[in-house]
Curated annotation (Swiss-Prot):
The gene is DCAF12L1. Belongs to the WD repeat DCAF12 family. WD repeats lie at residues 87-137, 138-184, 185-252, 253-297, 298-341, 342-376. Pfam families: Beta-prop_DCAF12. This is DDB1- and CUL4-associated factor 12-like protein 1. Keywords: Repeat, WD repeat. SMART domains: WD40. GO terms for cellular component: Cul4-RING E3 ubiquitin ligase complex. Residues 1-35 are annotated as: Disordered.
Amino acid sequence: MAQQQTGSRKRKAPAVEADAESSPSQGLAAADGEGPLLLKRQRRPATYRSMAHYLKVREVGGWGPARLQGFDGELRGYAVQRLPELLTERQLELGTVNKVFASQWLNSRQVVCGTKCNTLFVVDVESGHIARIPLLRDSEARLAQDQQGCGIHAIELNPSKTLLATGGENPNSLAIYQLPSLDPLCLGDRHGHKDWIFAVAWLSDTVAVSGSRDGTVALWRMDPDKFDDTVAWHSEVGLPVYAHIRPRDVEAIPRAIINPSNRKVRALACGGKNQELGAVSLDGYFHLWKAGSALSRLLSIRLPYFRDNVCLTYCDDMSVYAVGSHSHVSFLDLRQDQQNIRPLCSREGGTGVRSLSFYRHIITVGTGQGSLLFYDVRAQKFLEERASATLESSSGPARRKLRLACGRGWLNHNDFWVNYFGGMEVFPNALYTHCYNWPEMKLFVAGGPLPAGLHGNYAGLWS
């Protein structure tokens, strides 16, 4: 692996705040230690700290620990199904950045985001404070090229949450930062991609794969211990220095007969513990790779819905890939010849599925129309609203699909907006990214207006 040190002319990024909040259980324990109620309170298990937990215990019956051991997984599944209908939105102000394409939780308060205007920043969801992160610059000057409108499309944390992968100042390069400090570690700008990076996935703590608009996937290996010997802070001016690396392997996806000019790699997802990698290309194909010291393609299959395949996720519990397209989500179970899970239709006016995530058997769908939908893959139906008590009848409550509508966000009232959209005051935001903080039951959602010429952003915390 070739390495070289380079000094960045940008300031050191502010360190991410440590998550030092005390847990609710510690507060309860302290309260229980006062007065003569100690013995009585000890009889109640300390695990019942929420109404959802209490209701589920009452439903299955009994308080004995022997009966609790068998339904811990059932309780989690119950919480996953009930959480969406309990969420309420609080919008976050992001200033004038254009369209948030990617996001990830760093800790219980901070989310890192990447935008179409090539801005990388951390937002504190409690205080609203925003800190920009300097982008890493290539070691050699590149030929002048128009990079307007490219942006940061991917942000991924490795399994141990010690490294963060995203795009560099040149969107063709892969930037790696250390966590929690967000100090730069290395930049993959040598013999890698020749066009923008659209997707990143971690196969392990030190191995990442990137997918590009040039139709290639690249395998990168990071060795922080090795970099410690070569990466240091400049002793005189305190500028960050980072290594420059090249990929271990670069492979091109096969060129399709139907649409050979549109084989851009749009999304990646790591497929469980088998070192397998799923990839979706804009020509309407799904590709499966085996990753070791190099990449080996296992198969390529035509997707049933092949317009705007822009997002991909994997469900560990069910060993299923989900692909978002123009108006559907398709499910791929590669263990079976026949697909037993039928595709779901988002029915959001053909604005497309823009973001997907799995948690257990529930998939969250972010649409181009500013809506969040929730689908139970096992039951093969959308989660439904619970009707109010006044609407219930003897035949049971009326149900309809649970749909969370996101707020207006911010929109730049420029000439494009006036000339092409007649000065529409309300314009739905495409939800390009969302990420859960499950321990605290929080959901971060972000995006911006769908038309390419419109400039704006949306971010919201649902809790």
